[in-house]
A protein has these predicted regions:
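Long helical/loop segments within the catalytic core of UDP-sugar-dependent glycosyltransferases
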Residues: 64-109, 113, 127, 133-212, ...
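Catalytic donor-sugar/metal-binding loop of nucleotide-sugar-dependent glycosyltransferases
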Residues: 220-237
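Short beta-strand-to-loop acidic/aromatic patch adjacent to the donor-nucleotide binding site
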Residues: 112-124
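A short, conserved beta-strand element in the Rossmann-like catalytic core
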Residues: 124-125, 217, 238-239
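Juxtamembrane C-terminal module of membrane proteins
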Residues: 21-22, 268-281, 311-411
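Active-site donor/metal-binding and catalytic loop motifs
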Residues: 233-247
């Protein structure tokens, strides 16, 4: 007997909803006429979607009020800082580089610091990486002075052009599978997902603020001066890849030019065993200039063969049928592997930017079929660095890589 009639309850709820909606609409119309709503929305957006700097400042202020909580510091590099470790202010503007900023930040480290981790602003490290770093530091502090992990630059996958998507996938494959082997021949250090002993940073003089690849330069210098060879860190971090070919080319051109700078610098260190310098320089040349040229030459083989065949200058029957089937099979394997890489690293993608329509998702998959053209373009920035350096026109200024906007979380 005490139960209300369902239709009566629904009618009450409907009337209440209409009443509330009308009052809200009236308030919004009134506020829009007076301009009051503009300020309210602006303040609401600033509170809901803070910038990275605002979040850091907020966390730093909260941590400062709690005893026993790790300190958070947010520092700005002075415009006139000379860039050297323990350097000085010159009173005049100094070009900005990543190495310069890192050296300024080292000054704010707690003297008790044993190891320093480096990440980019948009990095998302593995949640267990610090546990592993601490474990290695306790088990073998000498061999774990430099720990370098893989970086999967695929998170803004859906915001990239098709070429950059393919490049990002194969960059992730290289870091995932090839990086452990690379450590057998090169003391490779990347600029992110790397942990370096604090005392080693001080002993070798911090980061070089003049070369374009301060990370690779640090790895070679730490090895030659202190015998510190990087160890593979089996925990990945996800980041972004430049979304357009222009930005991609500029970043890779900087990497290639920086590599050439390191090759030239390796022999300039004093009080270092000359044989070690020569061996390291040879390894850098093999992994750099030689591989770039061979890869670029290999990309010319298919188009040259097509032109020769079209001009009746090459007989296709010279290749046995089994060989032709094998070549066709390789093409299918490469395309299949590209789709496998897409699925393998899908957990690291920002899926909030994935197209909602089936047509949009279909276009993403179809873009992966541009692999043959993309593969031709992969080595172009590096061979361009070779050509420009030979002409004395290589880039000399460090340029920050543009980032794409990511989904913002409510703080």
């Amino acid at each position: 007997d005490g139960l209300a009639h369902p239709f009566g309850s629904q009618d009450i709820i409907r009337r209440m909803t209409d009443l509330i909606a009308k009052r809200v609409c009236q308030a919004v119309r009134k506020a829009s006429r007076t301009g009051e709503i503009r300020d309210k929305i602006r303040h609401a957006l600033l509170d809901l979607y803070p910038t990275t700097q605002e979040v850091v400042d907020r966390v730093a202020s909260e941590a400062a009020q709690k005893p026993g909580v790790p300190a958070v510091r947010h520092v700005v590099v002075p415009y006139d800082f000379d860039g050297a470790l323990n350097g000085k202010k010159t009173g005049r503007p100094v070009p900005s580089t990543k190495g310069r900023a890192l050296n300024w930040g080292i000054n704010y480290l707690d003297p008790r610091t044993e190891v320093v981790g480096f990440y980019d602003a948009e990095s998302r490290p593995h949640k267990d990486v610090l546990l592993y770093v601490g474990y290695r530091r306790m088990m073998d502090p000498e061999k774990s002075r430099v720990l370098q992990g893989p970086v999967f630059q695929v998170r803004n996958f859906y915001q990239m052009t098709p070429f950059c998507r393919i490049a990002a996938l194969y960059q992730a494959v290289a870091h995932d599978w090839y990086l452990p082997w690379l450590f057998r021949t090169l003391p490779f250090v990347g600029g992110t997902n790397v942990f370096i002993a604090h005392d080693l940073l001080r002993e070798v003089g911090g980061w070089d603020c003049h070369v374009l690849t301060e990370d690779l330069e640090f790895g070679t210098r730490a090895y030659l001066l202190r015998g510190a060879w990087p160890e593979y860190l089996p925990y990945s971090s996800s980041e972004q890849t430049p979304p357009t070919f222009k930005a991609f080319f500029r970043q890779r051109l900087r990497w290639g030019t920086g590599h050439l700078q390191v090759v030239d610098k390796v022999l300039t260190y004093k009080d270092v065993e000359r044989s070690a310098q020569r061996r390291l320089r040879l390894s850098l040349i093999i992994k750099g200039q030689l591989e770039w040229v061979l890869y670029q030459l290999a990309t010319f083989v298919p188009p040259i063969a097509m032109v020769l065949h079209h001009q009746d200058l090459m007989d296709a029957t010279l290749v046995p049928a089994a060989g032709q089937w094998m070549l066709s099979g390789f093409s299918a394997i490469y395309l299949g592997f590209t789709f496998y890489a897409f699925r393998r690293y899908s957990a690291h993608l920002d899926n909030s930017c994935c197209p909602n329509s089936w047509l949009g998702r279909f276009c993403v998959y179809m873009g992966l079929f541009l692999l043959p053209l993309a593969a031709f373009m992969f080595p172009v920035p590096y061979t361009s660095a070779l050509v420009l350096k030979s002409m004395g026109k290589e880039p000399k200024a460090w340029v920050k890589t543009p980032r794409t906007e990511e989904t913002r979380a409510v703080s």
